[in-house]
Amino acid sequence: MAFNDLLLQLGGVGRFQKIQVTLVILPLILLASHNTLQNFTAAIPTHHCRPPADTNLSEDGDLEAWLPRDGQGRPESCLLFTSPQRGPPFPNGTETNGTGATEPCPHGWIYDNSTFPSTIVTEWDLVCSHRALRQLAQSLYMMGVLLGAMTFGCLADRLGRRKVLIFNYLQTAVSGTCAAFAPNFPAYCAFRFLSGMSTAGVVLNCMTLNVEWMPIHTRAYVGTLTGYVYSLGQFLLAGMAYAVPHWRYLQLLVSAPFFAFFIYSWFFIESARWYASSGRLDLTLRNLQRVAWINGKQEEGANLSMEALQASLKKELTTGKSQASALELIRCPALRRLFLCLSMLWFATSFAYYGLVMDLQGFGVSIYLIQVIFGAVDLPAKLVSFLVINNVGRRPAQMASLLLAGICILINGVVPKDKSIVRTSLAVLGKGCLASSFNCIFLYTGEVYPTMIRQTGLGMGSTLARVGSIVSPLVSMTAELYPSVPLFIYGAVPVAASAAIALLPETLGQPLPDTVQDVENRRRGKTRKQQEELQKQMVPLQASAQVKN
C-alpha cells in the first residue's frame, strides 16, 4: 500500500485536509499584494520643478515663467529656467516659452497628489536623475525572493515544511512592518529585500505542504484553488490601494496580518510524507493518526501500527534516509533533465509575466482599473487551465499557456500605439495565459520531483523565476532603441521555452515519486505497480536458484 492509499484509508479529503489547505493558502491573498505592491507605493505622479522659494505659486503666471515646455507644450519634469521668462508663450506649444538657460531642479519638485497622495517617489524624490532608484527597490525585492527560494527550499527538505513556513510568516510580518516605518530609502530597500526572501519561502512551502497531504486525484484542484486565491489578492490590492493611498499605511496593511498567520501556523501538521522520506517513522505514524482522528477515522488510525506502516512505506523508509542536496539536480541524469527543462519554463513564465504586470502606468488608463482587469482575467484563464490540467494533462496545459502568451505579446509588438484597446486586450490575454502557466508549473514541478528533493527542486525553479523577474525590467530599457523591442523579447522567450515541455513526463493520475529510482522508472515508462509485480515474479526464481545450489 503506497502513501496515497494510506491517505484514502484515513479519510482522503477529510476535515483535516479542508481546514489545513484553507489556512495554508489564506496568506497567499496578501502575498500577491507584496509582489506587485510597488505599482502603487512607488507610483510616479505628474511632477515639475519647484521654483525658488520667493515665487508666488498662487499666481499661474509666476509659476509658468519658471517652467520650460517640451515638444508637446507640457511643462518639463526635470528642468527649470535659471531666471523667470516673462515673454509670451509660443504658438501650439512647439517651443519653450523662453530662451533662457535651464538647470536640473535645484529646489526639488512639486507633485500632483490628486491620485497618489504619498508614495516612496514623492517622499524621497525618486524622479529625474534618481528615477532608477525606484526600479532598484523592486529589483532588490526580487533579489530577496531569489535568495529566499534558494535558501528556504533547501531548508524545508532538511528541517521540514512546517518549521520553515512558520519562520517565513514571522519574517514577512516583521520586515514588511519595518518597511512601513522605514526612515530613509536605504532602510526601506533593506526591509523589502528581507520581505522578498520570506515571501518566496511562503509560496514554496504552502504549495508543497498542501500537495503532500492530498490524494492524487485532488492535487489539480489544490493547485488551481491556490492560483485563484492569488488572483483574489490582485483584486484586493486594487481596492486596498484605492482606499488607502498613503504608501506607509498600505505597506502596513499588507504586512501586519502575517502576525496572525504566524500565530495560527503553529497548529499546522507537518507532512507525514516528508517524515517518512526522512526515515522518522514514529513521527510519520503520530501525524497520520492525528489526521485520522480529525477526519473521524479513529478506528482506522488506531489500527495503523508501526509494523503496518513499515510494510506500506518500505521503499520510502529504505531509500529516503539520506538527504539529497541541490547538487543532485545536476549530478543525477534523470533529475538533471527535469531541472534544465523546468528551469527554462520557470524563467520564461516569470520573465514575461513581470514584463507586463510591473508597467501598469504604461497603459495610459487608470492604474486601479488595469489592476482589477489583470486580476479578473485570471478567473476564466485558470478555469480553462484547470480543465485542461485535470482532463487532458499537465503537459498540454503548460505548452498551450506559454505559446498563447508569447503569441499575444508578439502580436502586441506590431499593433500601432494608437490602437490602445487592441493593445490592452492583447496584454490582458497574454497576462491571463502567463497566470495559467504559473498555476500549472507550481503543480507540475511538485509532481515530477521525488519527495527527497521536491522542495529543493521547487526552490531552484522559483530561483530561476526570480532571475527572470530581475532581468525583465532591464529588458524594458531596450525601448530606447525601438518601442516594440521589449515586447518582441517578452514574447519570443516563452515561445522558445515551450519546446522544453516535450522532454518532460506527463503526471496526470500518477503517484508522486518518492525516490530518484521512481523518476527513472517513470522516464522508462514503468509504473510503481509494474515494479512491484516484477519483484514478485523474481521471488520464486530466486528461491528456485537457492534450491538448485
Swiss-Prot record:
Cytoplasmic-facing ranges: 1-23, 157-164, 217-224, 270-337, 390-395, 447-456, 506-549
GO BP terms in the entry: alpha-ketoglutarate transport; organic anion transport; prostaglandin transport; renal tubular secretion
Intracellular or extracellular location(s): Basolateral cell membrane; Basal cell membrane
GO terms under cellular component: basal plasma membrane; basolateral plasma membrane; plasma membrane
PROSITE patterns documented for this protein: MFS
Keywords assigned: Cell membrane, Glycoprotein, Membrane, Transmembrane, Transmembrane helix
Keyword Ligase belongs to the record: no
Transmembrane segments: 24-44, 136-156, 165-185, 196-216, 225-245, 249-269, 338-358, 369-389, 396-416, 426-446, 457-477, 485-505
Cited InterPro entries: MFS_dom, MFS_sugar_transport-like, MFS_trans_sf, Orgcat_transp/SVOP
GO MF, one example: solute:inorganic anion antiporter activity
Top-level division of the source organism's lineage: Eukaryota
Post-translational modification: Glycosylated. Glycosylation is necessary for proper targeting of the transporter to the plasma membrane.
Catalytic reaction list: (6R)-L-erythro-5,6,7,8-tetrahydrobiopterin(out) + a dicarboxylate(in) = (6R)-L-erythro-5,6,7,8-tetrahydrobiopterin(in) + a dicarboxylate(out); L-erythro-7,8-dihydrobiopterin(out) + a dicarboxylate(in) = L-erythro-7,8-dihydrobiopterin(in) + a dicarboxylate(out); L-sepiapterin(out) + a dicarboxylate(in) = L-sepiapterin(in) + a dicarboxylate(out); prostaglandin F2alpha(out) + a dicarboxylate(in) = prostaglandin F2alpha(in) + a dicarboxylate(out)
Residues in the Extracellular compartment per record: 45-135, 186-195, 246-248, 359-368, 417-425, 478-484
Sugar-bearing residue positions: N56, N92, N113
Chain spans, region Disordered: 521-549
Main location: membrane
Membrane topology category: Multi-pass membrane protein
NCBIfam families per record: 2A0119 (TIGR00898)
Function per UniProt: Secondary active transporter that functions as a Na(+)-independent organic anion (OA)/dicarboxylate antiporter where the uptake of one molecule of OA into the cell is coupled with an efflux of one molecule of intracellular dicarboxylate such as 2-oxoglutarate or glutarate. Mediates the uptake of OA across the basolateral side of proximal tubule epithelial cells, thereby contributing to the renal elimination of endogenous OA from the systemic circulation into the urine.
Family stated for the protein in its record: Belongs to the major facilitator (TC 2.A.1) superfamily. Organic cation transporter (TC 2.A.1.19) family.
Domain note: Multiple cysteine residues are necessary for proper targeting to the plasma membrane.
Protein name (Swiss-Prot/TrEMBL): Solute carrier family 22 member 6
Source taxonomy: Eukaryota, Metazoa, Chordata, Craniata, Vertebrata
Gene designation per UniProt: SLC22A6
